[in-house]
Amino acid sequence: MAQEDMFNMDAWNRLYDRMRSGAEYADTPMPQSLFDSWPITVDGEVNSPYTALLPDLVKEAEAAGVTVTKVSKEVCNWNGTGAGSVSNVEITGIPVSWLIERAGGYADNADINGVRVMRADGSSKRAMPLDKVDGGEAFLVYKINGEQLTAANGFPCTNWCEGVDPEVNSKQMNEYKVVTDAPDFDDHVYEFEHHDGNPNGWIDADGNWTNKPNATVLGVPEGLVIQNGQPYTFHGYVDAYDEKIASVEFSMDFGKTWTKHDLGDTDVNKLVWFDFTWTPQEESAYCLQLRATTESGLVSPQIQTVMVNAKDAMPAADETVVIDTPSLVAPKTAAAEVAEGKE
């Protein structure tokens, strides 16, 4: 997946969000001087707090052979059933555990329970679990797909914590603070309501999951016309944030029967993509439904339904309507505006 195809939340009205959005929309690259002068601080409950420039840390980490390049997922906490706020990309970064070791390691304090990621504009200070940091699943990322980050993806750097929702993946972060006040990472309701940690899914008013696990078909507009008698492939993904996907199921009869596919040992740090190929046998409308299960037994709380129309004769180009505006309401013409003004 290319960087420009990654989802991002630059609709937030934060200082650096506005700068990133403006640069992205104007196709203006971020200045290299921002990377060259970007400070990273590691402090809090460590033995030797320090501040170092990002390029110096990169050079030192690369020389030490500790940088990591790997494929990793990012799935928005808000990502609903049928939505596409997901990314699967190659990241290159410095393990946060190495950055802490560079600070002399953790201080002798039994109450240490997390690492806060401090965003440079002060708008976020979410905490990561120690097991993610110590387990080599938290990174200071400075490249995606072998290239420096785009403006929308947080140039010059972003935090990246694997196997959790990306609300802790603060863009343009400048400080890792080892703390004793991190939340209970098993209390997803508290994390959700207090904007801390990793809720790992969206919850309703009763604290129930609404999008975990999530089984989604992508790129099929409602009522898509397909050729009868010819195979058609539905493409999509299944994910459950911090839980492994165990199976995915498909139904063509509105849930009366399900065809189950066991997935074996999946990687919680990567998206599970699928292709479901099916051949209609007669001209008609058809609906596909899908759901997923996790290792712990969670079942998709919401089920996506996509409808296609199988036709023996596909419509010609002049028999179709092409909507060339993203708006649901057609834009006014100059003549229409003049006519309205005369009323």
Language model features: what each stretch is:
Residues 38, 67-82:
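Acidic/histidine-rich, surface-exposed loop or edge segments in extracytoplasmic proteins
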Residues 72, 92-95, 155:
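Catalytic-loop motifs flanking and including active-site residues across diverse enzymes
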Residues 43, 77-89:
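Second-shell loop/turn segments in exported
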